A protein has these predicted regions:
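His/Asp/Glu-enriched, well-ordered alpha-helical/loop segment
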Residues: 105-106, 314-400
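Metal-associated gating/positioning segment near the N- to mid-region
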Residues: 80-151, 155-157, 230, 259-262
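Active-site core of metal-dependent hydrolases
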Residues: 173, 218-317, 335-342, 359, ...
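C-terminal cap of metal-dependent C-N hydrolases
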Residues: 35, 369, 375, 388-424
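Histidine-rich, glycine-flanked metal-binding segment
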Residues: 37, 42-82
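Bacterial Sec-dependent N-terminal signal peptides
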Residues: 1-29
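Divalent metal-dependent hydrolysis catalytic cores, especially in the metallo-beta-lactamase
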Residues: 119-146, 160-168, 209-224, 245, ...
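Active-site gating loops and adjacent loop-to-helix segments of metal-dependent hydrolytic enzymes
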Residues: 93-115, 173-190, 283-312, 326, ...
Length: 424
């Protein structure tokens, strides 16, 4: 009997010890000692700061903060520490042939949604480990392949960023295709939803949301026909009723004016926007996600070198004008072709060449990747700055990105939702 009682006591002591240990571990906070901490609201670095993180959120920030002996301490005293970066225009499941963009529609018949999802999972993890903790994927992902990537991240099967996702791209008849013969009519529906009336636009938005979209994208102006101001207003109202943002692919002119007056939240590309339209966007607090592709990115589509150079120069000019006017901007890349010898992130960051060529201050570029991007995405109360109660999405660099924006190409530390993903 005594032996039985002894065993019971030992087991009880063991269980109690496990509970105490578990509570002790749960009580542990993570402390980051930051040599230089980026204040994304001001665009300046603060020296010798401490962040205390609890259960995925920032508990405190400041200098000379006290913390517990058993807290986990991460020493980034020799690093430049920033909020996790955001890219507001990606296509993680797409990779079209280098200099063969005419083969775009061939992808519809050669790559399954499953294959595209696998590519998306690979690129999602790559983006996260490169410091991009939030992305907006806006289509060209076959039959909702990105939705499966999001599910895989949610299930914990893979690591990836927070993903905003548009579903299939909504467009007037034909999507963004051209030259498809009548026998193959509708081939584009692999990636697009035809919507030519207000009722069809509403139905397309609802379909996308049903299948996992949490933002809506409309293509405007890629055909001779395009949406009216009223069509855009219908789309904006329906999206906003569902609690999501509306963004529109458009380049210039009347098509862009309809987007602005119709109440969309952002313009994607806007490569040739006139000053008057940029001013209208500023007056309405509307965002431009400029996708300011550099020469190498444009040349990858095909065509000659002179044409790529001319296009890049026009993009730089629009970037200069938008910055001077004060149009709100959020960072977005739009790469769908990996450059030779470069992965997706390296190909994406080629566009920094155009930001530098336009004379945009590095501090502002960083703000478009953090606090301004968060505002566009509607998450500025939770992400985009490193302050009390904000989600602990944090990265660190070896060099000062305000002095040279290329420093963001070498991220050595990544924390996502308080979890250390990378620490080199």
């Amino acid at each position: 009997m005594k032996k039985v009682l002894t065993n019971i006591k030992l087991r009880a002591a063991f269980i109690l010890g496990c509970i105490i240990l578990s509570l002790s571990i749960q009580a542990q906070n993570t402390v980051i000692k930051a040599g230089h901490l980026f204040d994304s609201r001001t665009g300046k670095f603060l020296d010798d700061q401490i962040l205390i993180i609890k259960q995925g959120r920032i508990l405190q920030t400041g200098s000379n903060l006290k913390y517990e002996k058993n807290d986990i301490v991460i020493d980034l005293a020799n690093s430049w520490v920033l909020p996790g970066l955001m890219d507001c225009h990606v296509h993680i499941t797409s990779n079209y042939p280098y200099r063969k963009i005419s083969a775009l529609s061939d992808i519809y018949t050669t790559e399954s949604s499953g294959f595209r999802a696998l590519r998306g999972a690979y690129n999602a993890e790559l983006l996260l480990k490169s410091g991009f903790t939030t992305i907006k994927d806006i289509g060209n992902d076959a039959n909702y392949a990105t939705a499966d990537v999001i599910k895989a991240i949610r299930e914990g099967w893979i690591k990836g960023p927070t993903i905003f996702y548009s579903g299939k791209i909504i467009a007037p008849y034909g999507g963004q295709t051209g030259g498809i013969n009548p026998e193959n009519e509708g081939l584009w529906k692999f990636e697009y939803l035809d919507a030519d009336t207000d009722d069809e636009i509403i139905k397309a938005i609802r379909k996308n949301i049903y299948f996992g979209a949490n933002t809506i994208k409309i293509v405007q102006g890629d055909q001779q026909y395009f949406y009216t101001e009223q069509n855009i207003r219908t789309a904006a109202n329906e999206a906003h009723r569902a609690g999501v943002k509306l963004t529109c692919h458009v380049f210039e002119g009347e098509a862009a004016r309809n987007v602005i007056l119709g109440g969309a939240d952002a313009i994607e590309h806007g490569l040739f926007l006139e000053d008057s339209l940029l001013q209208m966007m500023k007056d309405r607090g509307m965002f431009l996600v400029g996708t300011d592709l550099a020469y190498n990115n444009i040349y990858a589509y095909g065509g000659d070198s002179a044409g790529a150079k001319q296009m890049s120069d026009r993009i730089i000019d629009r970037l200069k004008r938008a910055y001077k006017i004060g149009t709100k901007m959020a960072f977005g890349t739009d790469v769908i072709i990996d450059l030779p010898g470069k992965n997706r992130v390296e190909s994406n960051l080629e566009i920094l060449k155009n930001w530098k060529a336009a004379g945009i201050p590095s501090s502002y570029v960083l703000q478009t990747m953090t606090v301004y991007a968060a505002e566009l995405l509607g998450i500025d109360k939770n992400r985009g700055v490193l302050e009390k109660n904000y989600v602990a999405d944090i990265i660190a660099l070896k060099n000062n990105p305000v002095e040279n924006i290329d420093a963001i190409k070498k991220v050595h530390f990544v924390m996502k939702d308080g979890e250390v993903i990378k620490n080199e």
